[in-house]
Regions:
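Active-site activation/catalytic loop segments of kinase-like enzymes and analogous catalytic loops
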Residues: 53, 204-243
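Generic beta-structure capping elements
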Residues: 31, 83-84, 194, 209-212
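Juxta-kinase regulatory segment immediately upstream of eukaryotic protein kinase catalytic domains
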Residues: 1-5
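Helical subdomain adjoining the active site within ATP-dependent kinase catalytic cores
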Residues: 142-143, 243-246
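Active-site catalytic-loop/activation-segment of kinase and kinase-like phosphoryl-transfer enzymes
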Residues: 82, 114-164
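Conserved protein kinase catalytic core
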Residues: 35, 88, 182, 199-201, ...
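ATP-binding pocket architecture of kinase catalytic cores
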Residues: 8, 18-123
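Active-site acidic catalytic loop and adjacent metal/ATP-binding pocket
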Residues: 6-21, 26-28, 160-204
Length: 246
């Protein structure tokens, strides 16, 4: 059968194409060793395997909210999954425009809590995602170490955070869980972009997620109360559901 494709923009970590193949619509991604950034930002392209595996596990746990995995080309670091509908909007864009749908918020935090619960203290998950090298390259180095390079007085605090995050794992951490990686179509959501997945501490997902909401209170002060209220409700829901820690 014939196929056609369009390249997608917006990401820094790889080449992405929207592929039309018969009755299927796919997103196909190929990882880059040097990310598309002004400064040097290197990362092993084998992270596509991690993205494929994390996407697969998320789809097994919350299939209603995560696209299906179609294939993985190990030799060329290419990963293919079902595409979210083209009618989707990015949740981040909705929030920045003042559209606050608390049903979407519930689905987002409920999905995260289910994955954290299901994958907690799981030897198979630890086997697949136990190597935190990619997490270091994609999060610790560009976020924490880069900041310390500009503000050396933060070194002691940063070292304690690094030790905590790089220490013993508890569950499957998404690593990039934020409104920019959750697409919305009506009240259906699609959770995407799993390449920072690792067996780590769930506090990272909560902090990363919360940070995006707190930044929106600065960006759009007129909706700050609504933003913090939504975040509080989501965190309360998360902590009411987690079963693997006090």
């Amino acid at each position: 059968d014939g196929y056609s494709f369009n390249y997608c923009g917006g990401g820094v970590s790889g080449t992405v194409a929207f592929v039309y193949a018969g009755d299927k619509e796919l997103i196909v991604k190929q990882a880059l060793a040097q990310l598309k950034t002004k400064d040097t930002w290197l990362c092993d392209p084998k992270r596509m395997y991690i993205e494929k595996e994390a996407n697969r596990i998320y789809n097994e746990i919350v299939p209603e909210n995560v696209p299906e995995v179609y294939f993985y080309d190990e030799d060329n670091y290419i990963f293919g999954r079902a595409a979210a509908p083209e009618s989707c909007t990015m949740w981040k864009s909705d929030l920045l425009s003042g559209l606050y749908d608390f049903d979407v918020a519930h689905k987002a935090i409920d999905s995260l809590s289910k994955v954290h619960n299901t994958c907690a203290n799981n030897a198979e998950i630890e086997r697949i995602f136990g190597d935190k090298a990619l997490f270091y390259d994609l999060r610790i180095s560009p976020y924490i170490e880069f900041t310390v390079g500009k503000h050396p007085d933060l070194r002691a605090f940063a070292d304690s955070v690094n030790e905590f995050l790089m220490g013993d794992g508890i569950t499957l951490v998404h690593g990039d869980y934020s409104p920019k990686n959750i697409m919305v179509d009506g009240r259906k959501i699609y959770i995407l972009d799993f390449e920072v997945g690792h067996y780590g501490h769930p506090a990272f997902d909560l902090a990363f997620f919360s940070n995006h909401f707190m930044l929106k209170t600065v960006k759009n002060k007129q909706w700050a109360d609504t933003t913090t209220n939504m975040l509080k409700l989501m965190l309360d829901e998360y902590f009411s559901k987690v079963e693997f820690m006090d």
